Amino acid sequence: MKRRTAAQALIAAGLAPAAFAQGGPVEGRQYARLAQPLQGAAGRIEVVEFFFYMCPHCNVFDPLLEAWAHQLPADVSLRRVPVGVTLMHKLHQRMFYALEAMGALTPQVHAGIFNAFHRAGIEANDEAAIVALVSKLGVDPVKFKAAFNAFGVQAKLGQGAALAQAAGVDTVPALVVAGRWRTGPSMAGTPGQSEVAQGQQALAVADFLVKQARSGKTS
C-alpha cells in the first residue's frame, strides 16, 4: 500500500519531470511506431504493459503505473502481459494468469508479489513455493493450484510471447499504446535520471500517445 500511496503523491503533487519542453515526445527517441499495428480492445484505447516480476526496473515502475491507471479516462484501459524466457519466468507467468483467471489478481496481490520478491527476498522458483506465496497473500491455495495447471493458463503463455514479439519488445518494462506505438522508461527517459523519473517520463509519453490515438493520428 505504501508503494501506491507514494506514487500517487508524486503524481498529484506534479513532481513528474518537465520533459519534452521543445514540442513533445519525438518518434524514434521517446517512442517507436510499430511496423505492423496490433489489434487492441474494441472501443477503447488499450495500453499494454510488458513486464516480469523479478525485474527490478519493473518493480520500480509498477507503483507509478498503478497510480497512473487509477486516473485513466473511461476510454482507456490498461492490460498487463508477463513475459520472460527462463523456467522461473514461465512459472511466474503461470502464476499471473492463474490469479487473473480466478479473479484474484487484485492490485494488492500484484503489489504483494513484487514486494515478496524485491523486499522479502522470497524465491518462488517452483510450484510449491508459488502456492505458498499466494496463500500468504490471501489466495485460496486449492483453487489456485487448479487454475495454475489449467490448459488455458498454459495457452496464455504462448499468446503473451507472440504479442511481445509482434510488438518488438526487447526490454522491460515496456508499454504499447493503441497497438501502434511502443515506449518505456529506458526509452522515454534520459541518462542520469532516476528510475522513478524515467518511469514518469514513460507515462507522460503514454499520455501523449493516448491523445494521438484519440485524435486519430497514426504518427
Regions found by a protein language model. Give the residues of each.
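Extracytoplasmic thiol/disulfide redox context detector
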Residues: K2-K90, D207-S219
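Extracytoplasmic/secreted proteins, especially bacterial periplasmic and envelope-associated proteins
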Residues: E46-E49, V60, L64-A67, K90-R94, ...
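Polar helix-capping/helix-linker motif
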Residues: F20, D126, N149-A150
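Sec/Tat-exported extracytoplasmic proteins
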Residues: M54, A69-L72, L99-G103, I113, ...
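Solvent-exposed loop/turn segments at secondary-structure junctions
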Residues: Y53-H57, G84-M88, A116-A120, G152-V153, ...
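Periplasmic c-type cytochrome electron-transfer domains
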Residues: G24-L34, I122-E127, V196-A206
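Structural microenvironment flanking redox-active thiols in thiol-disulfide oxidoreductases
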Residues: L72-F96, T106-V134
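C-terminal cap of thioredoxin/glutaredoxin-like
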Residues: K136-S219
